[in-house]
């Protein structure tokens, strides 16, 4: 995994933290022939890591800043098997052929999941920080007939202080894995 500090960052554009990327990549169970859609690509952390392990990645974000940040990181890490698009995933999904999906953004999520089901996408991994979004995604996947697994991860980083060491925690992330039955 590439360390978070190596990525170009832009104010207000999120990045999936290194440890969360590692687990999410594991849940995707990537194959070198996979073509992956990254919805809500943010700073491109997942796009870069997925592209290193798959045939091609389509990255989408509704933020122009996120699109630009992802593009910068793709160039920085010499990733050539990824294309970035600005727009709403539900409007762009039909333009691409892919077999796996990573979701880091939840705008219009229920409509997006319905479209993924129509395309018979067998493996989707979604990361959420907002509890209500986790419940919404889990419920929708179950309604659509997916097998759903989810885990909540809390990552803490060590920091040296004058009297010893402390652990500083980041926000917990729910990683949802949906597999078509």
Curated annotation (Swiss-Prot):
Q: A single Gene Ontology molecular function, please?
A: protein methyltransferase activity
What are the recorded Gene Ontology BP terms?
A: anaerobic cobalamin biosynthetic process; methylation
Listed under catalytic activity are: Co-precorrin-6B + S-adenosyl-L-methionine = Co-precorrin-7 + S-adenosyl-L-homocysteine + CO2
| Record: residues binding S-adenosyl-L-methionine | 16, 40-44, 61, 89
Q: Which InterPro entries match?
A: CbiT, Cbl_synth_MTase_CbiT, Cobalamin_biosynth_MTase, Methyltranfer_dom, SAM-dependent_MTases_sf
Record's keyword terms, sorted: Cobalamin biosynthesis, Methyltransferase, S-adenosyl-L-methionine, Transferase
Q: Hey, which pathway is this one from?
A: Cofactor biosynthesis; adenosylcobalamin biosynthesis; cob(II)yrinate a,c-diamide from sirohydrochlorin (anaerobic route): step 8/10
Under SUPFAM superfamilies, the record lists: S-adenosyl-L-methionine-dependent methyltransferases
**Broadest EC class assigned to this enzyme:** transferase
EC number(s) in its UniProt entry?
A: 2.1.1.196
* UniProt KW Methyltransferase keyword: yes
- Lineage, top-rank taxon, reads Archaea
User: What family classification does the UniProt entry report for this protein?
Assistant: Belongs to the methyltransferase superfamily. Archaeal-type CbiT family.
What's this protein's name? Probable cobalt-precorrin-6B C(15)-methyltransferase (decarboxylating)
Source organism per entry reads Methanococcus maripaludis (strain C5 / ATCC BAA-1333)
Q: What is the lineage of its organism?
A: Archaea, Methanobacteriati, Methanobacteriota, Methanomada group, Methanococci
Encoding gene, per UniProt annotation: cbiT
